[in-house]
From Swiss-Prot:
Sequence similarity: Belongs to the ATPase gamma chain family.
PANTHER family found in the cross-reference section: ATP SYNTHASE GAMMA CHAIN, ATP SYNTHASE SUBUNIT GAMMA, MITOCHONDRIAL
Highest taxon of the lineage: Bacteria
Subcellular location: Cell membrane
Protein name from the UniProt record: ATP synthase gamma chain
InterPro entries: ATP_synth_F1_ATPase_gsu, ATP_synth_F1_gsu, ATP_synth_F1_gsu_CS
Function in brief: Produces ATP from ADP in the presence of a proton gradient across the membrane. The gamma chain is believed to be important in regulating ATPase activity and the flow of protons through the CF(0) complex.
An individual GO BP term: proton motive force-driven plasma membrane ATP synthesis
Pfam families recorded: ATP-synt
GO cellular component: plasma membrane; proton-transporting ATP synthase complex
Organism from which the protein derives: Micrococcus luteus (strain ATCC 4698 / DSM 20030 / JCM 1464 / CCM 169 / CCUG 5858 / IAM 1056 / NBRC 3333 / NCIMB 9278 / NCTC 2665 / VKM Ac-2230) (Micrococcus lysodeikticus)
Keyword vocabulary terms for this entry: ATP synthesis, Cell membrane, CF(1), Hydrogen ion transport, Ion transport, Membrane, Transport
Membrane topology, record value: Peripheral membrane protein
């Protein structure tokens, strides 16, 4: 019986240590979420403005530009998948990978060859385990992205988009990331970056009315200059939203783990007390039985 009590004490001690770790990770994630949300909010005005500028140039001028031209028969697509480097974030990476698989299946059914670009070690492990290749991998800083990484990814994707499909280029670029809605809601999301879906002036609502610009030297050169900046800004915004979503998921996962640890400690404590009570009862029973035996003798 004493050995059983020692086992329960060891379990209580180890679970208590784990609970402290979970609590520390929860507090770290909580403290970083605020900054991550602020970065998402700060990136939105620029991303929206450059998208509107590109739409304005394209809708107000009859320009046959690779940025907005829909290929007649697209045969190749690039898919950028944003996951996390670390675990302990609930179903965050699993959800975005499930969304990516749905997109890959749809593109395959449309007869398109797909080049996969991967961000985060979780997605890397997912594809490596299944023996499925990917075009390029980026790891590190998934929970604290930097603009330089977005520019690097954007440069690779733009080069692929501007390259002829016969030479390994692509006709479309899609991004799969986690959209940060609130601390309790994050949605896996798919966005087609290129070709850009332009809002035509006739179809624009009062809120979507596009501004009029004059371009020097001409609108086509403006689009050439905007293409890499547009891609970079959209990718960076997606990375920031993914980072905020990862931290929110980790905070919830660590809180849940801490609550479960507390529940386990209560259960082990109850079992230990029951075992101690049974041990005391057994000892008393043996003492009484021994005393009775002495008296009867």
């Amino acid at each position: 019986m004493g050995a059983q009590i020692r086992v329960y004490r060891q379990k209580i001690a180890s679970t208590s240590s784990m609970r402290k770790i979970f609590k520390a990770m929860e507090l770290i994630a909580t403290s970083r979420i605020t900054k991550a949300r602020e970065r998402v909010s700060a990136s939105l005005p620029y991303a929206n403005a450059i998208t509107r500028a590109v739409s304005a140039v394209s809708s107000q001028h009859d320009i046959d530009h690779v940025l907005t031209t829909e290929p007649e028969n697209p045969t190749r697509a690039a898919v950028l998948i944003m996951s996390s480097d670390r675990g302990l974030a609930g179903a965050y990476s699993a959800n975005v990978l499930r969304k990516a698989e749905q997109l890959l299946t749809r593109l395959g059914e449309e007869g398109k060859d797909v080049d996969v670009y991967v961000v985060g070690r979780k997605a890397q492990t997912y594809f490596d385990f299944r023996g499925r290749g990917y075009k390029k991998l980026w790891t590190g800083q998934t929970d604290a992205p930097v603009a330089e990484r977005a520019a690097e990814i954007g440069e690779v994707l733009v080069d692929a988009f501007l390259t002829d499909t016969a030479d390994g280029g692509v006709d479309e670029i899609h991004v799969v990331f986690t959209e940060f809605v609130s601390l309790v809601k994050q949605n896996p999301h798919v966005v087609r970056l290129l070709p850009l879906e332009v809002v035509e002036e006739e179809a624009a609502t009062a809120e979507d009315v596009l501004p009029l610009y004059e371009y020097e030297p001409d609108a086509e050169e403006v689009l050439d200059a905007l293409l890499p900046k547009y891609i970079e800004s959209r990718i960076f915004n997606a990375m920031l939203q993914s980072a905020a979503s990862e931290l929110a998921n980790r905070q919830r996962a660590m809180k849940s783990a801490g609550d479960n640890a507390t529940s386990l400690i209560k259960d082990y404590t109850l079992l230990m007390n029951n075992a101690r009570q049974a041990e005391i009862t057994q000892e008393l029973t043996e003492l009484i039985a021994g005393a009775d035996a002495l008296n009867n003798s």
